[in-house]
């Protein structure tokens, strides 16, 4: 019952749009450096297996928390279907009924020897986590 009545931000990074590898992304659904903390509503691969899909009510809660605290954020998908990646722990917590969504910063060249993130995104991620931890049902 405790987990069913809990909310979680699964802190993880998101692959930022890379114009050199544009074929790996859906440009209109990708995360971009310098555009704020990223929320990935759906994570996983191959459809529903080992995946998590945050419900609309939880997305609404997240948006209200971010907007009431002036946190810059973006929503994104992890990349084109079945190109690999996307495994997080969000689905494990969702199995117990917890409201969970992946949240973090966009990373260019993820898992390469040289990764790049935006300092502004890191700052917004910190602000996002503080706002989330201070949120409750009465203030939202």
Give the predicted meaning of each segment.
Residues 14, 18-21, 25-114, 136:
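Active-site-adjacent substrate-binding region
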Residues 105-140:
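His/Asp/Glu-rich mid-to-C-terminal helical/loop segments that flank catalytic regions of hydrolases
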